[in-house]
Amino acid sequence: MDLTVKTLEGKDAGKVSLSDAIFGLEPREDIIARVVRWQLAKRQQGTHKAKGRAEVSRTGAKMYKQKGTGRARHHSARAPQFRGGGKAHGPVVRSHAHDLPKKVRALGLRHALSAKLKAEEIIIVDDLVANEAKTKALAGAFASLGLTNALIIGGAEIEGNFKLAAQNIPNVDVLPVQGINVYDILRRGKLVLSKAAVEALEERFK
């Protein structure tokens, strides 16, 4: 499929052909959802913790004698049923990450790219270069392209002025092509790819 290449000023700069093997798949929500779940589980800190009965600071002495009171038999006040006792089966520090085959992760990225193209939410720009590190000028350029909520993917490295100018614009994320991922593609409205990013993706998946 051919798409028109734009400049940051909104002018036409030729056309680029996109590979159907990357951008022309019929999007499968189940594969995309698996990759998103994998990403979000992997980034969870897992620092949640509640003290169990062995960890709470409370006396371990028997509460009262075993027989003769008419009350239920109890021992330690650290037991979970008592106020101030330990939590039964509480959260512990752990990793939430789970495995996902590399082929499924790669397939999920291709389906996410295909979904964006099908929704007509991909814009190709010739180059991501700013003459000066001024947010106002770049924000104006984005407005001319209709970019109010976007993920922008550049080549292997993002040009310095462009990176500085873009980092303060709300709802706009800028990543090098090696940082492209399913979750960030889906959480933003438009996907902006530089020609260098398109070439790198086609090289990666060929």
Curated annotation (Swiss-Prot):
GO biological process, one term: translation
Basic residues compositional bias, start-end: 64-77
Quaternary context: Part of the 50S ribosomal subunit.
PANTHER family hit by this protein: 50S RIBOSOMAL PROTEIN L4, LARGE RIBOSOMAL SUBUNIT PROTEIN UL4M
Pfam families, alphabetized: Ribosomal_L4
Family indicated by similarity: Belongs to the universal ribosomal protein uL4 family.
Species whose genome carries this gene: Sinorhizobium medicae (strain WSM419) (Ensifer medicae)
Highest taxon of the lineage: Bacteria
Protein name in UniProt: Large ribosomal subunit protein uL4
Single GO cellular component term: ribonucleoprotein complex
Function comment: One of the primary rRNA binding proteins, this protein initially binds near the 5'-end of the 23S rRNA. It is important during the early stages of 50S assembly. It makes multiple contacts with different domains of the 23S rRNA in the assembled 50S subunit and ribosome.
One GO MF term: structural constituent of ribosome
Region (Disordered): 63-93
Alphabetized UniProt keyword annotations: Ribonucleoprotein, Ribosomal protein, RNA-binding, rRNA-binding
NCBIfam families: rplD_bact
InterPro entries: Ribosomal_uL4, Ribosomal_uL4-like, Ribosomal_uL4_dom_sf
Origin organism lineage: Bacteria, Pseudomonadati, Pseudomonadota, Alphaproteobacteria, Hyphomicrobiales
Gene3D superfamilies: 3.40.1370.10
